[in-house]
A protein has these predicted regions:
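N-terminal secretory signal peptides that target proteins for export/translocation
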Residues: 1-12
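Bacterial N-terminal signal peptides
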Residues: 19-30
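Acidic, polar ligand-binding/catalytic clefts
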Residues: 103, 107, 112-184, 254-261
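Extracytoplasmic small-molecule ligand-binding "clamshell" domains
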Residues: 44-140, 149, 214
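Ligand-binding clefts/hinges and TM-proximal coupling segments of bilobed small-molecule sensing domains
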Residues: 42-58, 194-207, 254, 284-305
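Periplasmic-binding protein-like
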Residues: 80-81, 158-165, 171, 237-286, ...
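A ligand-binding cleft/hinge motif common to bilobed small-molecule-binding domains
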Residues: 123-124, 140-149, 205, 219, ...
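Bilobed "Venus flytrap"/periplasmic-binding protein-like clamshell domains
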Residues: 81-83, 94-108, 163-217, 237-239, ...
Length: 305
C-alpha cells in the first residue's frame, strides 16, 4: 500500500506550494483506495473457527475416520456362528452385548453400521480386518501375540479367566495319586480346542506336554470330552459356566477347573493403518458407563429368550 510520510509532505510543500500539494494528496488517496479494492476481492469472514487473519479454518479429518464417514457406514466383521449373549439372531435381527457395543461406536461416528458375517472362524475375523475388508472385528476376540502382528487391539472390554472342563473318568486315570493342581499344571493328557481359535495357541503355550486336538466348533469339542475321546476341553470360564448352567447334571460326569492366573482379554481388532480409529474406539470403551464382567455376561445369558 502507498503511504504519504511526513517528510514527503514537507518536501512537496517546499517544492510545489499549496495547490499542487493538494492535487498530489488527492492522487495518493485515489491510488490507495484502488489498491485496497484490488487486494480485498473476498469479504473477511468472522466466525468461531478463524485464523488470526480472519481466514476460515478447516480442520483436517484423519484418513481412517474420513474413509468411514465418506462411506457412510462402519463395517464390522463378526463370526458367522451365533454366540449368545455376545451376538445372535433374534426375530431376524442381530442382537447381543457385542452388537450393542458396535452400534455405540457407529453412533459416535455418526454413521450407519453393517455387520459382515462371512468369517467362519475367529482367525478369519482377524484376517478380514488385516485385509481391510472390515473396519473393526468384534467377535469375542482374544488378544494373542500372533494376531497382534497383523492388527491393532483395543483396550480390553471384558476379562475372563481360562478354564478346563474334564472328563472325570479320563482325568482320574491321568491324575492317579497326584494333587489336582500338579496334574493340571503338568497336564499330559489330550486337550480339545476349537480350530483356528486363540485357545489353540494358548493350549500349546500353557500346556506344552498335552496333546492338543482341534475340532471345528465348541459342540464338537464337548462331544469329544463327554465320549472320553479327549481328557478335557480348554476355553474361557464363561463357556464352561454356561455349560453347567445349561446342563446341571453334567457335574456327574464332568469336572471344571478355573485357572485364576491365566486371563483371556477380549478386545476389538482394528487395522494397523487406522491409528486414529484405534484411539477413538479406546475412548468410546473408556466412556462406557456399564463395564462388562463375568456376572453381567451370565445374567445377560439368563435373560436371553
Amino acid at each position: 500500500m502507498t503511504q504519504v510520510t511526513h517528510s514527503t509532505f514537507k518536501a512537496a510543500r517546499r517544492s510545489w506550494g499549496v495547490i499542487p500539494l493538494l492535487a498530489l494528496l488527492m492522487f495518493f488517496a485515489k491510488t490507495t483506495l484502488a489498491l485496497a479494492a484490488t487486494n480485498n476481492t473476498k469479504p473477511v469472514v468472522i466466525n468461531d473457527a478463524t485464523s488470526g487473519a480472519g481466514t476460515p479454518v478447516s480442520t483436517p479429518v484423519p484418513a481412517d475416520i474420513a474413509r468411514i464417514r465418506q462411506r457412510g457406514e462402519l463395517i464390522v466383521s463378526m463370526l458367522s456362528t451365533d454366540t449368545p449373549p455376545f451376538f445372535f439372531e433374534k426375530e431376524g435381527r442381530l442382537v447381543g452385548l457385542e452388537v450393542d457395543l458396535a452400534r455405540a461406536i457407529a453412533r459416535e461416528l455418526k454413521v450407519d453400521i453393517r455387520f459382515n458375517r462371512e468369517a467362519n472362524s475367529f482367525n478369519e475375523v482377524i484376517d478380514m480386518v488385516a485385509q481391510r475388508r472390515a473396519d473393526l472385528g468384534i467377535s469375542k476376540l482374544s488378544r494373542t501375540l500372533p494376531r497382534a502382528q497383523i492388527v491393532y487391539f483395543s483396550q480390553p472390554y471384558l476379562t475372563l479367566n481360562h478354564a478346563l472342563v474334564l472328563n472325570r473318568v479320563a482325568f482320574a486315570r491321568l491324575a492317579s495319586n497326584e494333587k489336582l493342581e500338579d496334574t493340571v499344571r503338568q497336564f499330559k493328557g489330550t486337550l480339545g480346542v476349537i480350530a483356528k481359535s486363540s485357545f489353540t495357541e494358548f493350549a500349546k503355550k500353557h500346556f506344552p506336554m498335552a496333546k492338543v486336538i482341534e475340532y471345528p466348533n465348541w459342540n464338537a469339542v464337548l462331544d469329544a470330552v463327554n465320549n472320553g475321546e479327549v481328557t478335557g476341553a480348554y476355553r474361557d470360564e464363561f463357556e464352561i459356566k454356561r455349560l453347567l448352567k445349561n446342563n446341571p447334571t453334567a457335574v456327574l460326569t464332568l469336572r471344571t477347573v478355573t485357572l485364576k492366573d491365566l486371563e483371556d482379554t477380549l478386545s476389538i481388532a482394528i487395522g494397523v493403518t487406522d491409528p486414529t480409529l484405534l484411539a477413538f474406539v479406546n475412548q468410546v470403551l473408556s466412556q462406557q458407563p456399564d463395564k462388562l464382567d463375568i456376572h453381567k455376561v451370565l445374567n445377560a445369558l439368563k435373560e436371553k429368550p
